């Protein structure tokens, strides 16, 4: 059994995130912990002195409808009971919401949150600054899900030969061995005539975790058409590593992943060391 964080912020209840948690529970029983956060992270509003300590300034609380949050918690608990999911409910009142979520992630196997609704009250353009921060700071893998999407039945492994890409793929296989028989495509980018990076080693590893594995190298001139292709194949779950880090290749760059998140078309699994 795995511990899954299901994240809700402010007055938002993500139907897409709950749908994914329910799907995972149908594959294998999980413990789902509903984390209900403050509607704003006050860290950005608090001043810091030259020693790095928070300055004692007055901060006006962001308006929150406590009754809505309480109602969302009740909906979460009722739905978990109806689905037969073991659950816990955490009402996190820490003013530094993202710091609290990072702490929660330290004690979880995976986090699920809405790539569409996460702190949309701060900025509706995703990935907004809050989502970017938690993608960098999380201490467990994240499943990003849109609000309206098809449940995945295939896997797309983004591989550039670098350690973070391999780490993400291994984390995915450890968490979801039940997807062994799914059609899986491992893709990499051909740059300057380079060969498939560490092909023998990568194929040796991946073939033991994915029964229906194919490897594909995307030429540089076909990169744009590949980006279009992936957005139209909504039955895939994309596995990628190290969002926002310089180690990402051109094919799986920060801007590419941001475009996928912005498009609200795919489930994305992100993991980093």
Place the predicted regions along the sequence by residue.
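Small/aliphatic-rich secondary-structure junction motif
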Residues: 1-57, 137, 150-218, 235
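Redox-cofactor binding/interface segments in oxidoreductases and associated redox assembly factors
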Residues: 6, 113-114, 157, 240
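Structural beta-alpha unit
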Residues: 39, 74-111, 208-238, 242-258, ...
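A short acidic, glycine-rich active-site loop
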Residues: 55-70
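Short secondary-structure boundary segments
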Residues: 115-116, 241-243, 272-273
């Amino acid at each position: 059994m795995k511990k899954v964080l299901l994240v809700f912020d402010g007055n938002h209840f993500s139907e897409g995130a709950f749908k994914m948690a329910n799907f995972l529970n149908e594959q294998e029983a999980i413990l789902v912990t509903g984390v209900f956060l403050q509607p704003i992270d006050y860290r950005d509003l608090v001043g810091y002195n030259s020693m790095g300590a928070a300055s004692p300034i007055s901060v006006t609380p962001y308006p929150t409808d406590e009754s809505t949050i309480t109602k969302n918690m009740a909906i979460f608990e009722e739905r978990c009971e109806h689905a037969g999911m073991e659950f816990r409910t955490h009402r996190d009142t820490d003013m530094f919401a993202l710091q609290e979520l990072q702490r929660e992630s330290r004690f979880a196997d995976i986090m699920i949150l809405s790539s569409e609704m996460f702190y949309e009250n701060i900025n509706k353009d995703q990935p907004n600054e809050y989502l970017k921060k938690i993608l960098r700071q999380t201490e467990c893998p994240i499943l990003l899900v849109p609000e309206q999407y098809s449940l995945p039945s295939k896997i797309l492994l983004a591989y550039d030969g670098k350690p973070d890409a391999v780490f993400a793929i291994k984390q995915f296989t450890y968490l979801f061995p039940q997807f062994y028989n799914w059609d899986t495509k491992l893709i990499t980018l051909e740059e300057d005539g380079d060969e498939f990076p560490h092909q023998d080693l990568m194929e040796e590893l991946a073939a033991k975790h994915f029964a229906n594995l194919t490897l594909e190298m995307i030429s540089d001139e076909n990169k744009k058409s590949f980006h279009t292709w992936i957005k139209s194949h909504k039955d895939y779950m994309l596995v990628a590593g190290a969002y926002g880090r310089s180690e990402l290749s051109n094919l799986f760059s920060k801007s590419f992943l941001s475009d996928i998140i912005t498009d609200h078309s795919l489930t994305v699994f992100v993991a980093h060391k």
